[in-house]
Amino acid sequence: MPRSQRNDNFIDKTFTVIADLILKILPVSKKTKEAFAYYRDGMSAQSEGAYAEALENYYEALRLEEDPYDKSYTFYNIALIHTSNGDQTKALEYYRQALDLNPKMPQALNNMAVIYHAQGEQAAEQGDMEMAEALFDQAAFYWKQAIRLAPDNYIEAQNWLKTTGRSKLDILI
């Protein structure tokens, strides 16, 4: 039985019913409907911390999904799982894939910046200030892009950019 049919959460069930109705009404392919079902089941598993199951569903959704915009959110969710599991290298890889398909995704840019900032902090703690500065510059690069897309968000990042003197760095978009 698909995860979406065994979910006990009222809101998730309501969303599932509404989404299924919309998919029945809209003229979309069977493949698109299947991709959405896997994506939805992946989100459900992810919200319950069942990351292995979520990844299986997301990979199947990626295989079936044809729309680049929809695929970008699947890549983003896969990146979130890898971030939660502490695999920053894989997380960055999937955030990049999401951004390749959807460059206007400030949350992916922010999450990449957070990873680079954390890596910079680790390098600083280990006394490698040159590496720390390079990683902080990477964090600034991604935070500035995120802030350009969502200027009312990421207030802490904006403050960090100002206090570290990185708010004036030129970045290529």
Curated annotation (Swiss-Prot):
Its main location: plastid. TPR repeats lie at residues 35-68, 72-105, 120-153. It is a peripheral membrane protein. Signal peptide: none annotated. SMART domains: TPR. The keyword Amino-acid biosynthesis does not apply. It comes from the Eukaryota. It is found in: Plastid, Cyanelle thylakoid membrane. One of its GO terms (cellular component) is cyanelle thylakoid membrane. Transmembrane segments: none annotated. Pfam families: TPR_11 (PF13414). Coiled coil: none annotated. Belongs to the Ycf3 family. Essential for the assembly of the photosystem I (PSI) complex. May act as a chaperone-like factor to guide the assembly of the PSI subunits. PANTHER family: CELLULOSE SYNTHASE OPERON PROTEIN C, TPR REPEAT-CONTAINING PROTEIN MJ0263. This is Photosystem I assembly protein Ycf3. The gene is ycf3.
